[in-house]
Design a protein with these regions (language model features):
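Terminal peptide-recognition signature
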Residues: 15, 158, 247
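Glycine-rich phosphate-binding loops that contact phosphosugars or nucleotide phosphates
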Residues: 1-100, 107, 144, 179, ...
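C-terminal non-catalytic interaction/assembly regions of soluble proteins
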Residues: 220, 249-250, 270
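A residue-level detector for conformationally permissive "hinge/kink" positions
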Residues: 13, 34, 135-137, 169, ...
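Residues at alpha-helix termini
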Residues: 35, 160, 210, 253-254
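Internal helix-turn-beta structural module
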Residues: 229-259
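Active-site phosphate/pyrophosphate-binding segments
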Residues: 59, 65-69, 79-186, 256-284
Length: 284
């Protein structure tokens, strides 16, 4: 952003988000926005962090501080916060009626209930296919639409905890190169909720199962993870996320993988993505 995308049109809203409030790239982005004479808006879960001295307007998005470095609540809370922000902004701009605002907020409330049900569904899938999941070596996760974002978060969580290669792709992107490196040792997840994406995801999952039996298809209409129905297809992919978060924790615990390679400590000492005031919670 600071080097390539910091041209800020007058009608464009720019905000900087950092759950910890100590990420150096986010702090630099706030400084860049302020240097251009614009209001530097920072959104964080820790209003006492370094964000407070770099932001002109500091917003606490309400998830609180997590007790571990491999955060999980923050991403879900942030998605909900941004949805509510968008709805309120649309209402204030006259683009969403009072009734429309109430209806959309009700959808979010229904989604929150569905999220609670998705957690035990994820635990059940982990138990039923524990042998395959505990033997994961290389992981590919492909998703379309909002599910692509979930795929990226899921890959990050598996990689930073289990310390295995995990890549995220857009559903169609997976067909343009990534499929060529598949072997029976791969574990594959295909995420889709929109009806059009669902058909394509099912097709890819069936094809991938010809290479590896460790193939999973997540959707709101059947599939390997029986999540409850969501009131909006844009919200459904977030119901897939608890499975990956729970799996990352449970398998890292069971396989004793919390500690990293000894040389990772040297890397962290040489360069950091956090400011000097940050207290690391990650296990090295």
């Amino acid at each position: 952003f600071c080097a390539y995308e910091s041209c800020l049109p007058a009608d464009e809203l720019a905000v900087v988000i950092s759950q910890s409030g100590y990420s150096t790239n986010a702090l630099h982005a706030l400084d860049t926005i302020r240097a251009k004479g614009r209001t530097a808006i920072g959104i964080t879960s820790d209003p006492g962090s370094d964000f407070r001295t770099h932001a002109d307007l500091l917003i606490d998005y309400g998830c609180g501080q997590e007790s571990v470095g491999y955060v999980t609540m923050g991403v879900t809370a942030l998605c909900l916060f941004l949805c509510l922000f968008a709805l309120r902004s649309a209402h204030l701009a006259g683009r969403l009626s009072e009734d429309g605002l109430a209806a959309e907020r009700q959808k979010l409330a229904q989604w929150a209930d569905a999220y609670e049900q998705a957690i035990p569904a994820g635990e059940a899938l982990l138990r039923s296919r524990y042998r395959q999941l505990s033997a994961m070596q290389t992981v590919c996760i492909a998703g379309a639409g909002a599910a692509w974002g979930v795929a990226r978060e899921a890959a990050l969580k598996l990689m930073e905890t289990l310390q295995i290669p995990a890549c995220a792709y857009e559903l169609e992107e997976f067909l343009h190169g990534p499929e060529l490196h598949l072997t029976p040792n791969h574990t594959l997840f295909f995420l889709a909720s929109d009806p059009h994406d669902r058909a394509r995801g099912a097709q890819l999952s069936r094809a991938a199962s010809l290479v590896t039996e460790k193939t999973f298809f997540f959707t709101d209409d059947g599939g390997d993870l029986p999540v409850p129905s969501s009131p909006d297809a844009l919200l459904t992919p977030l119901l897939f996320l608890p499975f990956f978060q729970l799996t990352a924790y449970r398998l890292t615990e069971d396989l004793h993988r919390w500690h990293k390679h000894p040389l990772v400590a040297d890397f962290e000492s040489a360069v950091s993505g956090k400011s000097a005031n940050y207290v690391s919670k990650e296990v090295l």
